[in-house]
């Protein structure tokens, strides 16, 4: 979207706070239903980030695939579980929880250091295609394929990795209960 600077900044802050609050809700809420709805909030905020960066197709794919399919699948899996086991139980951390927390924290800090050490000055941020494409010779499907393999390659791959992780998490939750 081509918005004026202050409005764009306000929307970025609003969506960023929605992402942070939704992510904290996914991790900290003890009721799995509330965690699943917080995950839905996170996925919708990510889709709105794509809309702000003029990636309308990726935003639509994000909404259809993740919010419409994966999040609904997770909510159904959680609803089929026995919800009374999770409402007020307090449990102590096990060794596996500590190891998982340590691994996730180390990955987070390595990502933060990588992002901070990267020289972002040489990267050209453009929304135009890297190839010259004749409008008359290509169909809409071919244009989508060209854009997915050039301009939106990295977001498309990240979306596929997130989808894989979400499916593995849903399968793991369903097997445990």
Swiss-Prot record:
UniProt subcellular location: Plastid, Chloroplast thylakoid membrane
The UniProt record lists the keyword NAD: yes
Main location class: plastid
Protein known as: NAD(P)H-quinone oxidoreductase subunit 6, chloroplastic
Membrane topology: Multi-pass membrane protein
Origin superkingdom: Eukaryota
Family stated for the protein in its record: Belongs to the complex I subunit 6 family.
Keyword Membrane in annotation: yes
Subunit: NDH is composed of at least 16 different subunits, 5 of which are encoded in the nucleus.
Membrane-spanning segments: 10-30, 32-52, 61-81, 90-112, 152-172
GO cellular component: chloroplast thylakoid membrane
Entry's EC annotation: 7.1.1.-
């Amino acid at each position: 979207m081509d918005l004026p600077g202050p409005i764009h900044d306000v929307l970025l802050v609003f969506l960023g706070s929605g992402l942070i609050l939704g992510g904290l809700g996914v991790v900290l809420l003890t009721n799995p239903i509330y965690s699943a709805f917080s995950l839905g909030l996170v996925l919708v905020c990510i889709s709105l980030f794509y809309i702000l960066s003029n990636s309308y197709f990726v935003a639509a794919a994000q909404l259809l695939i993740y919010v419409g399919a994966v999040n609904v699948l997770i909510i159904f899996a959680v609803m089929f579980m026995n919800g009374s086991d999770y409402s007020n139980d307090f449990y102590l951390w096990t060794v596996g929880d500590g190891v998982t927390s340590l691994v996730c924290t180390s990955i987070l800090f390595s990502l933060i250091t990588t992002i901070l050490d990267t020289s972002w000055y040489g990267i050209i941020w453009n929304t135009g295609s890297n190839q010259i494409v004749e409008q008359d010779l290509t169909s809409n499907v071919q244009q989508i394929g060209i854009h997915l393999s050039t301009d939106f390659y990295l977001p498309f791959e990240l979306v596929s990795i997130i989808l894989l992780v979400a499916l593995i998490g849903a399968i793991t939750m369903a097997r445990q209960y």
